[in-house]
Every structure is written in C-alpha cells, then in structure tokens.
C-alpha cells in the first residue's frame, strides 16, 4: 500500500556476530520518499550494503539511489529465504542482538504478527503478512540489513586507489 518506508540497520562485528535495529520508519503520505535517498546517500561512505527486495515498492527509488552513487543489492526470493533463515539461526545461536521493545515498537509488532510462507520446496521461507492491516516492513528491512551486512564484500574502511 506504500504508506510507510522503512530502513533497517545492521552492524556486523569481526567475530561474525551482528546487531540489528529499525533505523527509520516514516509515513510516506507525510514525508514522501526522497528523505530515504538523502539519508542513504549520507550513510553510503560508511555502509557495506544497501539492500532492496525485488518485490518491494522501494524499487521505485533505484534510479535516484543509483544517481546518488549508491550501489544497491536487489534480492530475489531465494535471497530472502537465506536471509530469513540466517536471522532465525543467529537469534537461536545467540549471535544476533537487537534493541529492547520500548525503542523499537514497530519492529516488535512486526515480529509478533509476521507469519512465514514457503519459498520453493527445500525448506526456505519468507516473512508474510497475516492480513492486509499488518505492516511487517520493519522485520523485512532488518532481515535484509542483516543479509547485506553478512554477504557484502564491500569494505567502506578500505583505502582505495584509482589508476588512470
């Protein structure tokens, strides 16, 4: 329904543990969408990835993100299946942390309400909305942020040289 735009964030540590949180959750009817492009452009130099699911309405921002110099990873359903599995595994194994509920109401609501849907026949799954009124975008955004942090080869701290 395109009424919310959500940005999740993930910090990956050297020991392959990670921390996720809901970074932004805004009403697009009030704030529009360009705020997200501007925010991501400011953060890009320190980011390892910006990830958008191919079925997300946020794909409409791809031209603006590309014009801002941001390399966007667009995921497919199998990427989502791997990402959801990784989030579940890391939570179970105690290698993924998150903020408490009081600072992340929308994320916690999405976690409580989301159901799962199968992806393919090999046991992969994705998050699903139980009804049209439930917004699970905070959970999806944090899941994709984790996926980007754990799979990206981009190192924003690496010095780079240009040869002409």
PLM features: what roles do these ranges have?
Residues 85-94:
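Short, surface-exposed amphipathic charged segments that create phosphate/polyanion-binding patches used
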Residues 1-77, 81, 85, 98-164:
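RNase H-like, metal-dependent nuclease domains and their acidic two-metal-ion catalytic environment used
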């Amino acid at each position: 329904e395109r009424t919310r735009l959500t940005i999740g964030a993930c910090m990956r540590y050297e020991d392959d543990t990670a921390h996720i949180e809901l970074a932004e959750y805004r009403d697009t009817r009030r704030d529009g969408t360009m705020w997200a492009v501007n925010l991501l452009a400011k953060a890009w130099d320190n980011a390892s990835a910006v990830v958008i699911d191919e079925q997300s309405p946020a794909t409409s921002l791809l031209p603006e993100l590309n014009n801002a110099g941001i390399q966007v990873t667009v995921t497919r359903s199998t990427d989502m299946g791997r990402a959801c599995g990784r989030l579940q595994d890391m939570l179970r194994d105690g290698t993924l942390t998150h903020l408490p509920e009081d600072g992340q109401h929308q994320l916690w609501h999405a976690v409580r309400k989301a159901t799962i849907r199968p992806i393919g026949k090999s046991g992969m799954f994705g998050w699903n909305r139980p009804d049209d009124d439930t917004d699970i975008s905070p959970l999806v955004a944090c899941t994709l942020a984790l996926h980007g942090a754990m799979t990206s080869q981009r190192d924003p701290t690496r010095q780079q040289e240009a040869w002409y």
